[in-house]
Amino acid sequence: MSYIVRFTGLLLLNAFIVRGRPVGGIQH
């Protein structure tokens, strides 16, 4: 279940970063 938590955390963090910053410089 560790990988699930890590995957969810990564998705949340990625979504938060994309929402906080305009998509253009970092498109991962």
UniProtKB/Swiss-Prot annotation:
One of its GO terms (biological process) is L-leucine biosynthetic process. Keywords: Amino-acid biosynthesis, Branched-chain amino acid biosynthesis, Leader peptide, Leucine biosynthesis. It comes from the Bacteria. Involved in control of the biosynthesis of leucine. This is leu operon leader peptide. The gene is leuL.
